[in-house]
Amino acid sequence: MSLRSAFALLPLFLLLIVANVESRKDVGEYWKLVMKDQDMPEEIQGLLDASNIKNSKTHAKENMGAIGEFEPRPYASAYGDNEIHAKENMGAIGEFEPRPNASAYGDNEIHANENKGASGEFEPRPNISAYGDNEIHANENKGAIGEFETRPNASAYGDNEIGAEFTDDFEPRPSMTKYNA
């Protein structure tokens, strides 16, 4: 056996020896039995922990009993420099509808009609999703659309320029998606 392999196995053997000594319940009684009723020297007693302290994991298991009924606590989290003023906005909510979602990726140019003068209700515009090198204008896709409600969403993948503003009062619009191969 080479010297390198002996040094590699040394920590394993030391661990086995220490683990066996610590696994004994009463080291002092074992010492007296082996050494024929001689007391353990104080130098060795300091090296071995012969106290009767329970393992923290076992102690935790003993204390766990049947948990009675409990109610979850309210939980609120804020991360970063967020400012939450729930009491200020309580009166302004009223009926809530989802906000439009606009995503742009890649080489597309999307221009939608802006509704700058709309302060009340307005007609929903179709939703457009484009993938590839497309130039899509919302004005070209006007047609008869049946009555259904979806969540507003505008997605385009490529280099995009989106010039659309959203107001607080809106209704969901229909969705149209175009994929190029």
UniProtKB/Swiss-Prot annotation:
Residues 94-181 are annotated as: Disordered. The keyword Membrane does not apply. InterPro entries: Organ_specific_prot (IPR024489). Residues 59-162 are annotated as: 4 X 26 AA tandem repeats. Keywords: Repeat. It holds the Pfam family Organ_specific. Sequence repeats lie at residues 59-84, 85-110, 111-136, 137-162. Expressed in stems. To organ specific protein P4. This is Organ-specific protein S2.
